[in-house]
Amino acid sequence: WQPIQQLMNSGGLADIDALLQSDEALMQLNQDFAEDSWTQRAVATYRHGCPVTAALTYALYHKVADLSIEQVLYLETNVAVHCAANPDFKEGVRALLIDKDRNPKWSRSLADCLSVEGQAYIDQHFGNPYPKGEHPLGDWLGSDALGSRYVG
């Protein structure tokens, strides 16, 4: 966990991406974490994973620092519902489970996600996808709760 935490706090997502996509950095990570298969798998997954997921993970990591567990679960529910409707979810299922070619064609690059329009797209995933008053976890949070801007 500590290597991931250090990485997430080491700069912006573009900086992290440059590091994780670098072959030299990958060799260094493999040396530093030779005994840590979890970290190695996390880096490999990042390098081949969906850029929208990377941007969402980075944003979520930084949004939840001061939220309660109830607020985090509420927010993650919002993100999960939006992700299920995301074209990249379908593409990932196709590439991994249906065609099994392991060659997904993601809808956006990381550079797209970091643009103003891309950030707006990422931010949409945090909004309440349910009609007012129908969020399954809505009763957990009051309107004055920290993080209530995510409660709609």
Q: PLM features: what roles do these ranges have?
A:
Residues 1-152:
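C-terminal alpha-helix plus adjacent terminal tail
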